[in-house]
């Protein structure tokens, strides 16, 4: 009987691994989404996903890395990482001028950034679990964060809050935890890798396949 039970567990684990989890990384601009995506991808595959930049909306299309096998606390999970364009309530092309981008290219970037936000919102229908990344040095109670979490809750999509940039002296990750106490919470530095193992624990514990 024990042998049979062991076989059943093996079969369950086998098919669980065959069902990849689509893990969407969402948040405002410049909260470290791409840095976090690169950290996860490099830790488990040795390869990064995209280019991180201090310029807002550097990621303007969904960037993907598929079939990443992560392991934590004796659990295995195969994920497809989806690094989403940064969300914003308003995009002003003049914001890009401060980074030495000429007016023509700034307007193009603003248009692409707007399209990227629309694409990211559409992808909410295709992700299984979301890492909602927030900058631990800033006020978490923004319209973007509140709207994002409200949409995820309405769609029944599991969420893990990630307070990023805890390596900064001004970081106050507890502000995020206290603002949204109903969600699983991890504080990390995607740049240095601090507490990243705690994030992998949370992903293997809370991520699930839609349906």
Model-derived regions: residue spans:
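Conserved nucleotide-binding/hydrolysis micro-motifs of P-loop NTPases
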Residues: 58, 86-88, 137-139, 165-169, ...
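Conserved P-loop NTPase architecture
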Residues: 1-26, 138-142, 146, 156-158, ...
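Conserved C-terminal guanine-recognition region of P-loop GTPase G domains, centered on the G4
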Residues: 108-183
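Charged, alpha-helix-enriched surfaces in structured cytosolic catalytic cores
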Residues: 31, 60, 115, 143, ...
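Canonical P-loop GTPase G-domain recognition
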Residues: 22, 165-211
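Conserved G1/Walker A P-loop phosphate-binding module
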Residues: 1-99
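Flexible beta-alpha connector loops of hexameric P-loop NTPases
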Residues: 88-112, 137-138
């Amino acid at each position: 009987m024990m042998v049979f039970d062991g076989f059943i567990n093996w079969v369950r684990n086998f098919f669980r691994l065959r069902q990849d989890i689509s893990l969407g990384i969402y948040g405002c601009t410049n909260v470290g989404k791409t840095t976090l995506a690169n950290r996860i991808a490099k830790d488990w595959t040795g390869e990064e996903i995209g280019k991180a930049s201090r310029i807002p909306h550097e990621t303007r299309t969904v960037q993907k890395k598929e079939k990443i096998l992560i392991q934590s606390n004796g659990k295995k999970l195969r994920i497809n990482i989806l690094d989403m364009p940064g969300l914003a309530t308003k995009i002003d092309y003049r914001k890009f001028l401060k980074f030495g981008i000429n007016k023509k290219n700034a307007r193009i970037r603003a248009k692409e950034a707007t399209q990227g936000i629309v694409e990211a919102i559409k992808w909410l229908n295709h992700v299984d679990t979301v890492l909602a990344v927030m900058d631990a040095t800033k006020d978490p109670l923004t319209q973007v964060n509140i709207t994002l979490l409200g949409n995820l809750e309405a769609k029944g999509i599991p969420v893990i809050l990630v307070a990023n940039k805890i390596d900064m002296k001004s970081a106050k990750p507890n502000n995020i935890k206290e603002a949204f106490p109903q969600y699983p919470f991890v504080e990390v530095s995607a740049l240095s890798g601090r507490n990243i193992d705690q994030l992998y624990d949370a992903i293997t514990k809370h991520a699930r396949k839609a349906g």
